[in-house]
């Protein structure tokens, strides 16, 4: 199973992986574990990095006025250990409208973003290698 979120303000049926900004001095792997807990309520341990997704976007989203931002998002395979899905800390509730478990085998077809679909496919392959 894969913990997925519907980011705040996004339409029903749009599923994404938890992610967020790295705090100063925080390793990327620790950021991934923190963001999963903050955005889903689930805690876990890392089984290693799956890869990076790189993209460019404009902010604010008006091309004539916005600044082009280059972003790298690192994804890690996280094994669930405890917590209740949807038990989101009050400070993060504004970021997420819905949390749910998705069957990992179906996740590449259910996630909205191409890079995240690829990470779900990599997670399936990694779990097969690890025989988990």
Question: What positions do the PLM features span?
Answer:
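NUDIX/MutT-family hydrolases
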Residues: 75, 86-120
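C-terminal alpha-helix
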Residues: 122-130
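Conserved N-terminal beta-strand and adjoining loop/helix that marks the start
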Residues: 1-2, 21-24, 72
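The catalytic Nudix box helix
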Residues: 17-51
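Active-site segment of metal-dependent pyrophosphate-handling enzymes
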Residues: 41-84
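N-terminal strand-loop-strand
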Residues: 1-17
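Short aromatic/basic micro-patch
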Residues: 16, 70, 101
């Amino acid at each position: 199973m894969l913990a997925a979120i519907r980011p705040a303000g996004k339409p029903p049926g749009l599923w994404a992986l938890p992610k967020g900004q790295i705090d100063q001095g925080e390793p990327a792997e620790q950021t991934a574990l923190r963001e999963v807990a903050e955005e889903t309520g689930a805690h876990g341990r890392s089984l290693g990095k799956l890869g990076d997704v790189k993209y460019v976007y404009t902010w604010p989203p008006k091309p004539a006025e916005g600044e082009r931002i280059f972003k790298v998002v690192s994804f890690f395979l996280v094994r669930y250990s405890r917590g209740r899905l949807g038990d989101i800390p009050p400070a993060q509730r504004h970021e997420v409208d819905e949390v749910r478990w998705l069957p990992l085998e179906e996740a590449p077809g259910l996630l909205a973003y191409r890079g995240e679909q690829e990470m779900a496919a990599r997670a399936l392959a990694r779990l097969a290698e690890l025989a988990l």
